[in-house]
Structures are given as structure tokens and as C-alpha cells.
A protein has these predicted regions:
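Polybasic, low-complexity RNA-engagement segments
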Residues: 1-202
């Protein structure tokens, strides 16, 4: 999605009502951000939006990119936000062999997750339960503690690396990925070094 360098439009300050709506949407999608929300989106902060190509919008606070959105879909975290709060987002892990493909903007395929170096959520993990979101985070071995459904946002970690390398939306649920072991898993991801990562937001 952001393989090429980007030229963003001038930033526009969001109204207080729009900021409140985005804050609620962010917490609904990523409940584990709740303890950090005042740091990310302070109530008196000046959140700005920047229009990007292909109907994408980037949200910026004090020139720091926070999250982006494609044509009204779920808010997706910018990798710089993920690196600040890595355990607040659902994650999967690719093996070493898949890293160079993901960092070139290729579609993430299932074999990169089902191999020995890959990692998917805990087998049999329960779906997200309303009111119990805070209990469904990371377990001891670093796996996400619930299965993730098709269409959910996901952070992509990499074998042997501490920081996330990409963010995207699941083209298949994690239970399906385990069962089939093949096919596309994440398409059009935002990845380290892409146009969104390199975009000047000051």
C-alpha cells in the first residue's frame, strides 16, 4: 500500500468532537491501549489529520504519526506507535526467511507463520469477549492469547527481532491459517522503510 515514497497533503487540525470519536474508536479496537491513552491522545492535545493517496488518512500529534485509516476502515497503528507500546496490539510472528519478503511489500503467506520460527496465537484461544478484553493479551511465551479473525488488525513481529516489522489486516483468521497452512495472510501491509515510515510529518 505504501511501497512508494509519499507526499502528504497539508495537515488539518481535528475538532474536539472528532478527536473524542477517534479516541473511542481506538480503544474499542485496541483495549490494551487503555492504560496508555492519555499519553497517546491527551485530551488537550492537538490531533491533526493528513490526507494520503488511495483514500488513506494519517493522524499525527505534535508531528508524531500515531495511526492511519483507509477509507473509514479500522484504525491501524503506525509502526512508531507499535514500537512504543508493543504488547498492546494483537501480534503474529514470521520466520527469518519471510522477513525480506515482508520488508519488500510482498503479501505475507501462511508458510512464514506455520514454520518452526513462526508464531500464531495460542491454540484454542477464545475469541475476544466483551468486558474481558484486558485479560486477553500476551501470555508467557509471547503469544497472543486468543485467535484472531479475518479482517482484524494485526502486528507482524519477526523471528530474532525485538521490534515489529509490519502492520496490516488479516486476510484469513489465525485458526484457518493453522488448519490450511497455505494462502495469503496479510496483504498491503505498512512495513519498516516504506513510504509511510519515511513520510515527513513535521
Amino acid at each position: 500500500m505504501f511501497k512508494k515514497d509519499l507526499q502528504g497533503a497539508p495537515k488539518q487540525k481535528l475538532k474536539s468532537s472528532a478527536q473524542r470519536a477517534l479516541r473511542q474508536s481506538l480503544l474499542a479496537t485496541y483495549p490494551l491501549l487503555t492504560p496508555h491513552i492519555e499519553e497517546i491522545l491527551p485530551k488537550k492535545g492537538s490531533l491533526e489529520s493528513m490526507k494520503l493517496p488511495d483514500r488513506n488518512t494519517l493522524y499525527v500529534l505534535d508531528s508524531v504519526p500515531l495511526f492511519y485509516q483507509n477509507d473509514g476502515s479500522d484504525l491501524l497503528p503506525h509502526l512508531k506507535l507499535v514500537h512504543r507500546f508493543p504488547q498492546a496490539f494483537p501480534s503474529i510472528r514470521i520466520d527469518r526467511g519471510a522477513i525480506r519478503f515482508v520488508l519488500s511489500g510482498a503479501t505475507l503467506m501462511a508458510p512464514g507463520l506455520t514454520s518452526a520460527g513462526g508464531r500464531l496465537p495460542v491454540d484454542g484461544g477464545k475469541p475476544l469477549e466483551e468486558g474481558k478484553e484486558m485479560e486477553q493479551g500476551i501470555v508467557e511465551d509471547g503469544r497472543w492469547s486468543r485467535e484472531l479473525a479475518k479482517g482484524e488488525p494485526v502486528v507482524i513481529m519477526a523471528e530474532g527481532k525485538e521490534e515489529a516489522c509490519a502492520v496490516g489486516t488479516l486476510a484469513a483468521g489465525t485458526d484457518e491459517v493453522k488448519a490450511k497452512g497455505k494462502g495469503p495472510v496479510v496483504e498491503d501491509a505498512h512495513f519498516l522503510g516504506d513510504g509511510l515510515w519515511n513520510l515527513h510529518t513535521a
